[in-house]
Amino acid sequence: MEGGASNEVAESSKKIGRGKIEIKRIENTTNRQVTFCKRRNGLLKKAYELSVLCDAEVALVIFSTRGRLYEYANNSVRGTIERYKKACSDAVNPPTITEANTQYYQQEASKLRRQIRDIQNLNRHILGESLGSLNFKELKNLESRLEKGISRVRSKKHEMLVAEIEYMQKREIELQNDNMYLRSKITERTGLQQQESSVIHQGTVYESGVTSSHQSGQYNRNYIAVNLLEPNQNSSNQDQPPLQLV
């Protein structure tokens, strides 16, 4: 029986623990301050998430019991309050079409300025500047994004290097083939020139031989003719009669 009673007490205590907290003023000052800090941070976080996820213009103003101001705005608190005042006045006095267009363009311009400011802040964070406004979780996310970006950059660089190496290898093979082709053409041309030189040399030798033999024969014929024209001293001396003195 005692065991069953203890189990019932434990179950009832668990149900009470899982129950909703009664919303009322916390009398204990310390507990109230701790709860204020927790709820304030949660509210600021929710306001930030709402502005980012839904692209909403959010302004949050909190005063503690001691009069300390806490605020958050994705644009500016003053600008959002002025927009709120104008929206309230427009509800009483509906704007004209021109005023509505002006308000629309002003909102678009404000949105673009906000986007530009966010991009500029992100660029500064990527460069390692203005990091004092980031908490540990945001710094961790920034580090992860930078590591992923560096990994993609290195992968792209490696891909380009591999492509460049492959191109250079193909180019080297093409140049080697061109070099071999040129060498073969030079060798072929050199062989033809040598053959032409040999033929020309042989023809020159042949012509010089024929000319020499012809000149030698001509010389012999001339020599024979000259000999024929010269008198034969022996025969002339024999045929002439001896002179007689009277």
Swiss-Prot record:
Classification of source organism: Eukaryota, Viridiplantae, Streptophyta, Embryophyta, Tracheophyta
Pfam families: K-box (PF01486), SRF-TF (PF00319)
Name of the protein in question: Agamous-like MADS-box protein AGL5
Record localization: Nucleus
InterPro entries, per database record: MADS-box/MEF2_TF, MEF2-like_N, TF_Kbox, TF_MADSbox, TF_MADSbox_sf
Gene behind this protein: AGL5
K-box domain: residues covered: 102-192
The MADS-box domain, residue ranges: 18-72
Complex formation: Interacts with AGL15 and AGL16.
GO function term, MF aspect, one: RNA polymerase II transcription regulatory region sequence-specific DNA binding
Gene3D superfamilies: Transcription factor, MADS-box
GO biological process: carpel development; plant ovule development; positive regulation of transcription by RNA polymerase II
Organism for this UniProt entry: Arabidopsis thaliana
UniProt xrefs under CDD domains: MADS_MEF2_like
Keyword terms: Developmental protein, DNA-binding, Flowering, Growth regulation, Nucleus, Transcription, Transcription regulation
Cellular component GO terms held in the UniProt record: nucleus
Function description: Probable transcription factor. Interacts genetically with TT16/AGL32 in a partially antagonistic manner during flower development. Is essential for the coordination of cell divisions in ovule, seed coat development and endosperm formation.
Major place of residence: nucleus
Coiled-coil ranges per UniProt: none
